[in-house]
């Protein structure tokens, strides 16, 4: 008996030592990827340009197309996904062998899980090439199996198969810093993408949110002014699932304010009743309500970095082609982003604060003194770029004003 216990103790000690060595080899004391989660307006511009050039609504079934994606855009997307879904950081770079993804995940005890995975050029769906986890080399086939298992576990196996059949080739060009994807378009791709993006229960929530908005505006005179604070207070605090139902309401309200047909996302919405048009305003301005709600919806559904990047991109674009850069609009964007982020991360606390009296001034601090209407030349003269000290100083002032509002503390 004693000999058996002795061998058991030795075996357990061996397992513990082996596990400790494996942990030390697979983890690092320093992160492989260190960066912020910010997304640049350039990335938004690149994504919009690619979508415009390869609009799925204009593609024919069986059409062969090539899309050249900037490596920097894939890099930003990798970091965004790593931050949003893994609470880590990510990077993508072009190498002599193809492309390489790098992921860092923080672990307890000030250790980091650092993964490198190379992707060589391929005909069809690419396979993982060289890979390392910390100091440990990993067989690419092992990661391929892990990805396949994750796809099955997520319930998107059929969508993955459709994408695999559509993908014809993947090539990398270090000179132009682009990744070329050759694909065969099939209408099922768009249909399945919609199904993955919005589950049946989310579509049901969107339907209920649309009906609630229809009922709220039914007794209003068409074109009558309605404050955004009144709408939010009437639709959000009564929800049993504030995060999910709140996201649905923000998306419905954003599509209404932006005059975007919700059927583009949910085909069934073509048969839903439409809300009566009223003039929704924030601080007396309809455009500020638009900025606030669209940014809130983006933050609630996609995260704060995406909402911030799109808001800044729009203002820079307005400076070049539209009504001019407006820091007042930017303040409304940031207020909406904070609202949507709070709904996604701290819904109970936000709803509790909405339950009392709510005014527009609780949503947006005074901003009438901020500069607006700056064309491209005026913006360059005063601020040069969003990276300049004058711009950052004014942006910090906006954040300080938002910090002073109890709703965003």
Language-model segments: which ranges?
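Second-shell loop/turn segments in exported
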Residues: 63-65, 132-133, 279-288, 321-326
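Membrane-interface helix/loop boundary segments of multi-pass membrane proteins
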Residues: 297-303
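"…centered on the first transmembrane helix and the immediately adjacent amphipathic helix/loop
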Residues: 192-287, 390-409
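Extracellular/lumenal and peripheral-membrane lipid-interaction modules
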Residues: 2-222, 334
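Primarily interfacial, aromatic-capped hydrophobic alpha-helices that serve as membrane anchors
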Residues: 342-409
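Small-polar-interrupted transmembrane alpha-helices in polytopic inner-membrane proteins
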Residues: 303-319
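Alpha-helical transmembrane segments that form the membrane-embedded catalytic/substrate-binding core
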Residues: 291-295, 318-352, 356-363
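Function-critical hydrophobic alpha-helical transmembrane segments in multi-pass membrane proteins
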Residues: 277-279, 286-292, 296, 314
């Amino acid at each position: 008996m004693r000999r058996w216990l002795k061998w058991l103790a030795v075996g357990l000690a061996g397992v513990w030592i082996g596990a400790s060595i494996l942990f030390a080899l697979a983890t690092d004391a320093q992160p492989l990827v260190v960066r912020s989660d910010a997304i640049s307006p350039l990335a938004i511009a690149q994504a919009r340009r690619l979508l415009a050039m390869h609009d799925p609504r204009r593609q024919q079934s069986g059409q062969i197309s090539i899309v050249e994606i900037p490596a920097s855009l894939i890099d930003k997307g990798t970091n965004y996904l790593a931050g949003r879904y893994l609470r880590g950081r990510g990077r993508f770079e072009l190498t002599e062998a193809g492309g390489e993804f790098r992921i860092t995940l923080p672990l307890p005890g000030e250790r980091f899980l650092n993964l490198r995975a190379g992707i060589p050029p391929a005909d069809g769906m690419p396979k993982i090439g060289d890979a390392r986890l910390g100091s440990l080399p990993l067989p690419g086939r092992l990661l391929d199996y892990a990805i396949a298992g994750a796809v099955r576990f997520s319930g998107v196996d059929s969508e993955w198969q459709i994408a695999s059949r559509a993908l014809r080739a993947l090539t990398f060009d270090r000179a132009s810093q682009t990744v070329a994807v050759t694909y065969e378009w099939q209408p099922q791709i768009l249909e399945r993408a919609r199904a993955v993006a919005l589950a049946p229960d989310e579509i049901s929530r969107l339907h209920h949110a649309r009906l609630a908005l229809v009922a709220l505006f039914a007794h209003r005179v068409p074109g009558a002014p309605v404050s955004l604070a009144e709408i939010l207070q009437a639709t959000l605090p009564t929800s049993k699932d504030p995060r999910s139902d709140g996201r649905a309401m923000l998306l419905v309200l954003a599509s209404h304010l932006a005059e975007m047909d919700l059927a583009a996302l949910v085909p069934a919405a073509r048969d839903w009743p439409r809300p009566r048009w009223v003039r929704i305003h924030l601080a007396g301005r309809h455009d500020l309500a638009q900025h606030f709600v669209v940014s809130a919806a983006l933050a609630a559904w996609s995260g704060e970095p995406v909402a911030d990047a799109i808001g800044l991109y729009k203002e820079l674009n307005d400076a070049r082609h539209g009504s001019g850069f407006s820091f007042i609009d930017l303040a409304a964007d940031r207020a909406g982003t904070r609202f949507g982020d709070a709904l996604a991360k701290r819904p109970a606390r936000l709803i509790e604060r909405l339950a009392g009296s709510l005014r527009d001034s609780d949503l947006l601090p005074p901003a009438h003194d901020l500069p607006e209407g700056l064309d491209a030349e005026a913006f360059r003269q005063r601020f040069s770029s969003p990276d300049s000290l004058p711009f950052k100083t004014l942006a910090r002032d906006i954040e300080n004003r938002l910090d002073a509002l109890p709703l965003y503390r």
